[in-house]
């Protein structure tokens, strides 16, 4: 489950860190590969209405979108 209080975190905005985008379809990053989404990354924890908690140190202060992507994506 999610850590206490996580649902109260602000939602990440595009370019929060590591070329993050809320919609993977919006990125033209060289590292992006089709099918890579926050929701299937090893840093992803859980869903709250389409948003989840990211365990990467640069994202622990925000929620990220399941359909999002960033350049430190790592397959789960």
Curated annotation (Swiss-Prot):
Cystine pairs:
none
| Residues reported in the UniProt entry to bind [4Fe-4S] cluster | 38, 41, 54, 70
What is known about what this protein does?
Answer: Specific class of high-redox-potential 4Fe-4S ferredoxins. Functions in anaerobic electron transport in most purple and in some other photosynthetic bacteria and in at least one genus (Paracoccus) of halophilic, denitrifying bacteria.
Task: Please tell me whether the keyword Iron-sulfur is annotated for this protein.
Answer: yes
Query: Quaternary structure per UniProt?
Result: Homodimer.
Source organism, top-level taxon: Bacteria
Q: What is this protein called?
A: High-potential iron-sulfur protein isozyme 2
GO MF terms held by the record: 4 iron, 4 sulfur cluster binding; electron transfer activity; metal ion binding
Instruction: Give the species.
Output: Halorhodospira halophila
User: Misc remark for this entry?
Assistant: In E.halophila, two HiPIP isozymes are found.
Instruction: Describe the family membership recorded for this protein in Swiss-Prot or TrEMBL.
Output: Belongs to the high-potential iron-sulfur protein (HiPIP) family.
Xref: SUPFAM superfamilies: HIPIP (high potential iron protein)
What GO biological process terms does the UniProt entry carry, in alphabetical order? Answer: aerobic electron transport chain
Keywords of the record? 4Fe-4S, Electron transport, Iron, Iron-sulfur, Metal-binding, Transport
């Amino acid at each position: 489950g999610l850590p206490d209080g996580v649902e109260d975190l602000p939602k990440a905005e595009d370019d929060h860190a590591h070329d993050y985008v809320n919609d993977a379809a919006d990125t033209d990053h060289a590292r992006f590969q089709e099918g890579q989404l926050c929701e299937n990354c090893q840093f992803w924890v859980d869903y709250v209405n389409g948003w989840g908690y990211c365990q990467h140190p640069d994202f622990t202060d925000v929620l990220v979108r399941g359909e999002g992507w960033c350049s430190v994506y790592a397959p789960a």
